[in-house]
């Protein structure tokens, strides 16, 4: 679903070029420079525990598709999921991307431009999987030979951790360390795992 890492794929029937960001991050990055940082207590991680979900948004990696992102934090376990859809109401699922991480810990508190606070974090990759939910997705990804796979089938996940895919985009290997940053504003969460000095513009709402 994931990124969350951008890949370029050629959509054979429409010649649409897009990058598969979810597995690294489907997030539109809003550049915010860090002015200062300090150590942060690991107990602060409790403030983001639970499930966070986005609205139905246009997928950044494929402008004719839509996505709902879900983040679930439980202790040091972190799940990031991207449900990809054909339609703007996000009712016709195309495929699901799921990244699982472990050993989540906070490293530094940061102050962004404007004075808002955030926290940098680190975690380890457990898995990064794609799950085809439609025959169209199976056909598309087999035709693309994405990540070297040409044997996708319905409802059978494939893990692409540590593989170079698309436009020479490499995905972190299992057990690799991923670093990111988040900013919490009451029940809204801005987060990215592709930078430690800027947060995404995609808003996650606490469920």
Residue spans for each PLM region:
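Sec-dependent bacterial lipoprotein signal peptides
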Residues: 1-18
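N-terminal cationic leader/targeting segments used for protein routing and processing
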Residues: 3-4, 32, 180, 184
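Short N-terminal edge-element motif at the start of the domain
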Residues: 35-89
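Non-cytosolic coordination micro-motifs
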Residues: 190
């Amino acid at each position: 679903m994931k990124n969350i890492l951008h890949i370029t794929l050629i959509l054979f029937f429409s010649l649409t070029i897009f990058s598969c960001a979810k597995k690294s991050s489907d997030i539109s990055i809003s550049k915010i420079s860090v002015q200062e940082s300090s150590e942060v207590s690991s107990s602060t991680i409790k403030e983001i525990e639970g499930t966070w979900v986005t609205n139905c948004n246009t997928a950044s990696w494929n402008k004719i598709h839509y996505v709902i992102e879900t983040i679930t934090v439980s202790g040091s376990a972190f799940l990031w999921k991207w449900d990809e859809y054909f339609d703007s109401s996000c009712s016709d699922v195309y495929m699901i991307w799921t990244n699982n991480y472990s050993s989540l810990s906070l490293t530094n508190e940061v102050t962004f431009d404007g004075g808002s606070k955030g926290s940098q974090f680190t975690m380890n990759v457990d898995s990064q999987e794609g799950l085809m939910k439609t025959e169209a997705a199976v056909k598309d990804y087999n035709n693309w030979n994405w990540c070297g796979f040409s044997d996708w089938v319905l409802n059978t996940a494939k893990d692409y951790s540590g593989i170079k895919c698309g436009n020479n985009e490499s995905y972190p290997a299992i057990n690799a360390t991923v670093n990111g940053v988040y900013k919490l504003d009451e029940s809204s969460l801005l987060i990215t795992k592709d930078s430690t000095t800027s947060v995404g513009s995609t808003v996650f709402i606490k469920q």
